[in-house]
Every structure is written in C-alpha cells, then in structure tokens.
Swiss-Prot record:
Keyword Membrane (UniProt): yes
Subunit (UniProt): NDH-1 is composed of 14 different subunits. Subunits NuoB, C, D, E, F, and G constitute the peripheral sector of the complex.
Chief location: membrane
Task of the protein: NDH-1 shuttles electrons from NADH, via FMN and iron-sulfur (Fe-S) centers, to quinones in the respiratory chain. The immediate electron acceptor for the enzyme in this species is believed to be a menaquinone. Couples the redox reaction to proton translocation (for every two electrons transferred, four hydrogen ions are translocated across the cytoplasmic membrane), and thus conserves the redox energy in a proton gradient.
EC class: translocase
Entry's EC annotation: 7.1.1.-
Protein name: NADH-quinone oxidoreductase subunit C
Gene Ontology terms for molecular function: NADH dehydrogenase (ubiquinone) activity; NADH:ubiquinone reductase (non-electrogenic) activity; quinone binding
Domain of life: Bacteria
Lineage, broadest ranks: Bacteria, Bacillati, Actinomycetota, Actinomycetes, Mycobacteriales
Length: 235
C-alpha cells in the first residue's frame, strides 16, 4: 500500500488510452459549408485505459481494502471490477453492473472504507462505444476518512438496465430519475422511476447524442434563423 501523503502523479504511468471513435470536421458535423478550415480536422475520441500499480495517494489502500472486503463475502475483485483508472489524480472503479450493489455496500459499510455519502448520479452517452454506449457515474465521499472514489458502470444501448442504489444511498433517488429522464438508463429496483424534469409524455431522452437537434424558426428583422445544425460558427 502506498503512503497517503504520496503525490499520485509521481506514482502513475497511465495505461494505454482506449480509442472509441474518430471525429472528423467541426464538432463532428459535415456539410456545413464551413470555410475556416475546421472541416479538415481529424480527432480521435479516447477514454483512459486501466492504470498500473502503484496507484498513488490513498488509492492503493482503497483498492486493497475493497478486495479483502469483497473476498470475505466470496466475491473476487476481478469479477466485480472491470478496471481501475487513475486519471487527473482521481480514482475511478469501473464496476460490472451485476456487482454494483455489492461493491457500493462494501464501500459504505466497511469501517476501513466508510464511503457513507453518494454525491449523485451522472449519465454519459458514447454512441460509438459498441456494447457500452451508456455510462452511469457515481461519485462517493468518505466523510470519515476524507476520501473520494468514483464508480462507473457501462451498459449497452439495447439493454440499459442498472441496479438502483436507492436502498444503499437514498440520496440517489432524484439523481437516478434525472439520469433515466435524460439518458434512458433504467435503474432496476428504484421505488418510483419516472421522469423528473421532462413532461411524462415526452418522447426520447434529450441528453443522448443521437437525440435530434431541434429549433424553432424565429424572425429577426425579416430574416429566419436556421436550425442549430445548419448554422455557421466562426468562433
């Protein structure tokens, strides 16, 4: 285990990034008539890869303690955790969705860990990460030990189910509803998984990247404003 006072930047050699997409043109859009040169841009879209040991800071202690805690209940670490990522001095555990409640329970209840607070749930949509298009991210806080860890779960677009953490962290109630509302992730076991911001009869999930851009034509001094995906931008 590494020292809590150790600077993680001195201990980490980041693993290879995972390329999930290649984006061409300005904001990935084509056919805009742009003359600024941005249309020739080619960028790879990457996610941080698995980090090697030592992780640095208190991260090794958290991972080692969680490993022992899971094993005491017959759960192997590699079966529950897909990869460990340390990026920008933050620890993220990528969790298998079936193991999410077990991992969260151990992180909360083990006195050596005591991540007693979940700060929310965020959704992310990676449409080109085949089989892992939808991600749910849970930042956890240990008030007892002044530590943070992030849990991340990925599910396919065709089966967007994740076990709800409401029974373990009741504060996720509205956050899971919001993530369902905007991304379409279904949190199994949530007591009332309904929309929270969009109308109940709304079609689709507005923060997904495949959600169509909309626009209302507005007249301004005799001119019509085109929809957002047809406008030029020079800044």
């Amino acid at each position: 285990m590494s020292s809590p006072d150790q600077d993680p930047r001195e201990a980490i050699a980041q693993g290879d990034d995972e390329v999930i997409d290649v984006r061409r043109g300005m904001f990935g859009a084509a056919g805009t008539g742009d003359t600024s040169g941005y249309g020739r841009l080619v960028r790879t879209v990457t996610l941080p890869g698995s980090s090697p040991r030592p992780y640095g800071s208190y991260f090794d202690d958290v991972v080692d303690t969680l490993t022992e805690s899971l094993q005491s209940n017959g759960i192997e670490f590699h079966q529950a955790i897909e990869k460990v990522v340390v990026y920008r001095d933050e620890l993220t555990l990528h969790v298998d969705r079936a193991a999410l409640p077990h991992v969260a329970q151990h992180l909360r209840d083990d006195p050596r860990l005591r991540f007693e607070m979940c700060l929310g749930v965020s959704g992310v949509h990676y449409p080109h990460e085949t089989g892992r298009e939808l991600h749910a991210v849970y930042p956890l806080q240990s008030i007892t030990h002044n530590r943070r860890v992030r849990l991340e779960v990925a599910v396919p677009d065709g089966d967007p189910h994740i076990p709800s953490l409401y029974r373990i962290y009741p504060t996720t109630d509205w956050h899971e509803r919001e993530t369902y509302d905007f991304f379409g992730i279904i949190f199994d076991g949530h007591p009332s998984l309904t929309r929270i911001e969009m109308p109940d009869d709304w079609h689709g999930h507005p923060q997904r990247k495949d959600y169509p851009l909309g626009g209302i034509p507005v007249e301004y001094k005799g001119a019509q404003i085109p929809p957002p995906d047809e406008r030029r931008a020079y800044n």
